[in-house]
Amino acid sequence: GGYPYRLYSDGTLNPVSYNDKSAYKRLSVMDGFRAMKEGNSLKVSSVTSFQLLHDSMDLDQDFTPKSMFTMNQTQDQYVVTQEVVFRPVNHPKWWDSQSGVFAFGKLNNMSAPVHFLSDGINSLILGQANAHIPEWVGRLSLQEDNFPITSDFRFWTYNVAAYHESYFRLGRWLLTAGFRLDHEGDFMKYDSRADIHFKMSYMSDYTPLSTTFAGHESEHFLQFLPKLSAIYDASFGSMPERGESLKFYASVSRGYKSGGFNSQIFSDILQNKMMKGMMEKFGMGSGSQNEMTAAATKYKPETCVDHEVGGRWSMRRAGHFLDVSANAFYVLCKNQQITVFPYGNGTGRMMANAGRSRSLGLEAELSWRWKGLHVDASAGVTDARFKEYNDGREDYSNNRIPYSPSSTLYASAGYRFTFGGRVVRAAALTADITRTGKIFWDEAGELSQEPYWTAGCDLRISFPHLDFFVRGDNLTDASYDVFYFKSVGNSFFQIGKPRRVTAGVSMEF
């Protein structure tokens, strides 16, 4: 297995080429329990779930033919959730409600050792260090031709919330008012360390150096999330008798995405501390300009206020089921979470907060069903930009937010043939096309993916207790990129999946 990351250099995308093992393995177990009890005044429902995840990821982290550094990350993760919802049994026609409590707990034991190899030692450690040592002093060298930087973590996360929604029917209006009070706690215990032996060219023996970066961090967030919405039934005349309805709606709500810790940056932190420790032995500076502390591992919650207006027209007549909807949205965000990469030859990536951002756009959907025929289509345009974002080096205000497509288009059509035979019961054929608009990959807007189309088709044949299906994706074999990142100062793109055909069988007893 591996990761299809292509080096981008001098305006050219090079073929996927790296020399160390890259693979991913996962074991996941999920289970849940649902219960419901109805009394004289309340209906109570409860949902409990549990998830166990164990995975292992091997990574050639420089993604080049050089032997620079590799990583093996393993996780043991345990998640428990509990939600209880209360609904009144008896209520007036004009009012209804639901209230609930939610609790969530997650424990994650993670180990992510980074192994520095010969090319990585020479370029990232010795190369940078010797660049700041006068030649007459001598040259720095290491006894090891490879060594690990171990990083062990324990993450605890909990979330408790209480929420309520009330629904008011006033003539043609349906009004909703609600809130959610959310409290989250995040804890991280970390222990990163490395042991090496170094010397200057004039020294006869190597000197041991042990570097440790250990401690714990915690964060707590309390959020009040209100919500208001209104739906107006604008059906007029004989529309209801003709099986038609027309509704308009508007809503405003506040949401948030929780903060957390950047575990991927710890090898960079320890590498800088290690270089600083060696140089201090000789009374010199390390020359590092991107030295980080534990504070750099934190990022804040992202909070947004979402405004939306729209309408929906529906028709149910003579076997036809037709729905057409359109909406416009305007979202204001504070502390927008974005992925950034350390300057220079850093090996990790981290989540950071931009100042403010805004997104606005339009969306439309269509769905038609008639006998065995079905047609679906959706389209959207989005303009997502930073309003205030300065990373200390550049001002990116008014630039496009990376990874956000400027437009999307999807359409599919198919027909289901019903035979009712003893052997073949039905067959369904569907074709679809997708267009993804321009995507900017970096905050400066210098790298982008131009719009591209993909096409697909699938066939499903139903037998008693068994379905056979075959699916073709990206039938035109379009070439496009789906992800961008940087490592050791190099830029990489992840290529999209090529033309492929999948066949399978599903069984039901």
Label each region the model flagged.
Residues 1-15, 61-70, 113-150, 187-219, ...:
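Solvent-exposed loop segments that connect transmembrane elements
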Residues 46-50, 99-105, 177-183, 248-254, ...:
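Transmembrane beta-barrel strands of outer-membrane/channel proteins
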Residues 244-245, 256, 371, 422, ...:
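C-terminal beta-signal and adjacent terminal beta-strands/loops
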Residues 92-96, 169-175, 183, 319-335, ...:
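Gram-negative outer-membrane beta-barrel transporters
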Residues 34-39, 43-49, 54-59, 238-240, ...:
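Membrane-embedded beta-barrel scaffold of Gram-negative outer-membrane proteins
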Residues 1-98, 104-106:
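Outer-membrane beta-barrel domain signature, strongest for Gram-negative TonB-dependent receptors
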Residues 31-37, 82-88, 162-168, 220, ...:
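Residues on the lipid-exposed face of transmembrane beta-strands in outer-membrane beta-barrel proteins
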Residues 39-87, 153-217, 221-234, 368-381:
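Surface-exposed extracellular loop regions of Gram-negative outer-membrane beta-barrel proteins
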